């Protein structure tokens, strides 16, 4: 193998949002994750809602009041 072309492979800590800390090896000094085996509903057996709002709901909440081109918000269609 060639020298000085590979990244530095070192011991790293993985920190979860629930407070669990794991140690492994990686090229990064530390890694932060949002969910792990200690708090994931599949592994704990507890049913809890992990995602508070999906991407579609966030979009609808943010841009739901905007009318798009070609749509009329309060205008009635004229009948002949």
UniProtKB/Swiss-Prot annotation:
This is Large ribosomal subunit protein bL31. Part of the 50S ribosomal subunit. GO terms for biological process: translation. Zn(2+) binds at residues 16, 18, 36, 39. SUPFAM superfamilies: L28p-like (SSF143800). Binds 1 zinc ion per subunit. Belongs to the bacterial ribosomal protein bL31 family. Type A subfamily. Its cofactor is Zn(2+). The gene is rpmE. GO terms for cellular component: ribonucleoprotein complex; ribosome. InterPro entries: Ribosomal_bL28/bL31-like_sf, Ribosomal_bL31, Ribosomal_bL31_A, Ribosomal_bL31_sf. Keywords: Metal-binding, Ribonucleoprotein, Ribosomal protein, RNA-binding, rRNA-binding, Zinc. Binds the 23S rRNA. It comes from Methylacidiphilum infernorum (isolate V4) (Methylokorus infernorum (strain V4)). One of its GO terms (molecular function) is structural constituent of ribosome.
């Amino acid at each position: 193998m060639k020298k000085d072309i590979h990244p530095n492979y070192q011991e790293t800590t993985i920190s979860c949002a629930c407070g669990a800390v794991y140690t492994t090896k990686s090229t990064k000094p530390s890694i932060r994750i949002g969910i792990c085996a200690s708090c994931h509903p599949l592994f704990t057996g507890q049913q809890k809602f992990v995602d508070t709002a999906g991407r579609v709901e966030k979009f609808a909440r943010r841009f739901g009041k905007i009318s798009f081109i070609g749509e009329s918000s309060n205008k009635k269609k004229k009948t002949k």
